[in-house]
Curated annotation (Swiss-Prot):
This is Ornithine carbamoyltransferase, catabolic. Reversibly catalyzes the transfer of the carbamoyl group from carbamoyl phosphate (CP) to the N(epsilon) atom of ornithine (ORN) to produce L-citrulline. Its EC number is 2.1.3.3. Its main location: cytoplasm. Pathway: Amino-acid degradation; L-arginine degradation via ADI pathway; carbamoyl phosphate from L-arginine: step 2/2. L-ornithine binds at residues 177, 241, 245-246. It catalyses: carbamoyl phosphate + L-ornithine = L-citrulline + phosphate + H(+). It is found in: Cytoplasm. GO terms for molecular function: amino acid binding; ornithine carbamoyltransferase activity. It comes from Lactococcus lactis subsp. cremoris (Streptococcus cremoris).
Amino acid sequence: MTSPLITKAEVNSVFQGRSLLAEKDFTPAEINYLVDFGLHLKALKQQNIPHHYLEGKNIALLFAKTSTRTRAAFTTAAIDLGAHPEYLGANDIQLGIKESTEDTARVLGSMFDAIERRGFSQKEVEDLAKYSGVPVWNGLTDDWHPTQMIADFMTVKENFGYLKGLTLVYVGDGRNNMANSLIVTGSMLGVNVHIVAPDSLHPSKEVMDIANKFAEKSGAKPLATSNIEEGVKGANIIYSDVWVSMGESNWEERVKLLTPYRITMDMLKMTGNADNGKLIFMHCLPAFHDTETEYGKEIKEKYGLTEMEVTDAVFRSKYARQFEEAENRMHSIKAIMAATLGNLFIPAVPEDFK
């Protein structure tokens, strides 16, 4: 009796050929594996050990939004892995305007081995994956930011040595993609994620339902609250993001609503961990912590504020890990790219992790 045909990818890797569109597309164990793989690749980079897992591959980088960290991370990660990255910006490619997303996906899939997309619509990135026939990586949409999550939890694991049982508190706009991704990913990995925000800016019921479903298995305790003291108590990680994205019109309303939620040294003291080495601050950047930017000057002129989501004192303090976190974007993206495109031998991932 002949054996059924089994492809190399099926034997060798649980990741090969897969897209990362949202964190929930992968299992908690797979997300943790990517975190650990990112740490491994970071060590190889620091020791100048080559890791050309994507030699000869061509990768399309599609950007509808401006980007510093995501573009730089994907570009350097691809080059380190031996691949050729090709940047296509908003003026180069306009999905759904002159050509449908389906048609564009089919064309790009015939020329490139994988596609990264940083844009607005989650459906758009899902359609790219559906029709291109190659792995697609979500570099950010309005709903999710999965590549950021691997970097973030890499940073947490670097600082604490483990994930399960830690408490990460996100303070600010609880409806944005960062809050969505943090509470879902944390619940997958056994991290207690608290969203501390005004009631009108709490995560949607759909997002909380996803988080709670994962939390039932991991033991995490996700929470959304407007009470700052309750929300930050016991925090190991205080996390922030910008209050208003560039191009949005409701600055005044949002600034008034969120000013009480600015991260200060006093807020860090409320955690109870400010003096025992069990607290760090993280921010996905860019941050409005001073007036050294055009936007910072505009905010000061309009609202009289020299700081927004975080004070300059916290941003420059011993707790701050935002630049380490930013560097980890490259290593984590490298892990995602290599795992899903590199034909690596990963037949299974450990279900138990800490």
